[in-house]
Amino acid sequence: MYNFINLIDRIDHILVERKLLLSKQKILIAVSGGQDSIFLLNLLLQLRFHWEWEIGIVNCDHMWNQFSQTASLYVSQLACQMNLNYYQCISPSFYRKEEKARSWRYKLFQRIAYLHDYTIIITAHTASDRVETLFYNLFKGSGLHGLHSLTWKRQIYKKRIHLVRPLLSTTRGELSQIFKQIQIPLYLDSTNLNVKIYRNRIRYQLLPYLRLFFNRNLDRSIAQFAEILHSESLFLETLTQILRNKIEIINKNQKILDIQFIRVIPFAIQRRIIKQFLEHQSIYSFDFCHIEKIRIISNIIIYKSDIYLPGGNRLTISKKYILLCSKISF
């Protein structure tokens, strides 16, 4: 049986060990009214006097159904009872796609944090969310970066605002057991039960099957795998950056890559260097097919060749260099 106090102590230790938060910070908590975010709110309230935080709550109502409005009302009442600053966001349009709704939420989180001087935005993503995201991105064909996209802490606005997820080592099952003990009211958004939504299908159909027939501790195992991927990917990104800085040359105000060096390094680093080189000069992202085509041509090129990429980008490859010509000004 999981204990609320023990879990608070564990997460308090994680905050210190991973340097997620500092004392006397102004933090904005995203609260939906569901299990995970209500637990997060209560957790941070238990710790706030020790850490001397100033806490605010933000809630987003997507206007999907009456339950979202009821949940928003409940969260606003909690904020009032706890004497916390409260920010209500109401969707101006109906977002049918999850990605667009998420993008809208995070833009508002960032805007509110910026306008009201919050340095930290905290969301209630758990180890179970990390598992769902890994499968979701895996089925979309993501690389290593996509498989560990839910990270503990990341910068979202220059060096001023960071997004923090302190529950990434805690599963949804652990939280369910705790809520049976403390009996705090929750509001379940019926939209989360709609299996027509891709992520819900993973949560309610795929993962229960895998837990039943393959590993009942699947959430913990996959979350640990995502954590390993994150650490190793950070190492590879740092290594790639160091190598790219050595082989990237500025010629007539244009950045070029030394193709002779690229040919002698492992394929995995070739792909990463090419991807970094392109995405540091363009607002577009490039998928595996684009990167692999460039990598293959770079290794066999005899004559000068042009490759046309999304957004009006043209890449020139010769026997000596790779050059990106872009129509987009920054």
From Swiss-Prot:
**What is the enzyme's main class?**
ligase
Q: Name one GO cellular component term.
A: chloroplast
So which domain of life are we looking at? Eukaryota
Q: Which UniProt keywords apply?
A: ATP-binding, Chloroplast, Ligase, Nucleotide-binding, Plastid, tRNA processing
EC number, as in UniProt: 6.3.4.19
Query: What InterPro entries does its record include?
Result: Rossmann-like_a/b/a_fold, TilS/TtcA_N, tRNA_Ile_lys_synt, tRNA_Ile_lys_synt_N
Report residues binding ATP: 32-37
Where is the protein situated, by its record's location annotation?
A: Plastid, Chloroplast
Q: What is its main location?
A: plastid
Domain remark in the UniProt entry:
The N-terminal region contains the highly conserved SGGXDS motif, predicted to be a P-loop motif involved in ATP binding.
Family listed: Belongs to the tRNA(Ile)-lysidine synthase family.
What is the purpose of this protein? Ligates lysine onto the cytidine present at position 34 of the AUA codon-specific tRNA(Ile) that contains the anticodon CAU, in an ATP-dependent manner. Cytidine is converted to lysidine, thus changing the amino acid specificity of the tRNA from methionine to isoleucine.
**Protein name as annotated:** tRNA(Ile)-lysidine synthase, chloroplastic
Q: Could you tell me which species this protein originates from?
A: Chara vulgaris
Q: What is the taxonomic lineage of the source species?
A: Eukaryota, Viridiplantae, Streptophyta, Charophyceae, Charales
**What is the gene name?**
tilS
